[in-house]
Amino acid sequence: MADDFAKGYSCAVATLIRLDNGVSTNARELFRAGGWSIDELKKVGIDVTDLDILKKYREELEK
């Protein structure tokens, strides 16, 4: 169940990044609120498309 939540959560963050054409303050705060690192989300098995977006903007998300 927790893995499913993490997958949906990461999808929401990735979608917000796509809609905003990059990392907005809201996307950064949403990502941080989840409490997962990108590496942890990768282990959970999030969608490859979502993972690619999170990895592309990793530096901005984790600052």
Region roles according to the model:
Residues 1-63:
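Intrinsic-disorder/low-complexity detector
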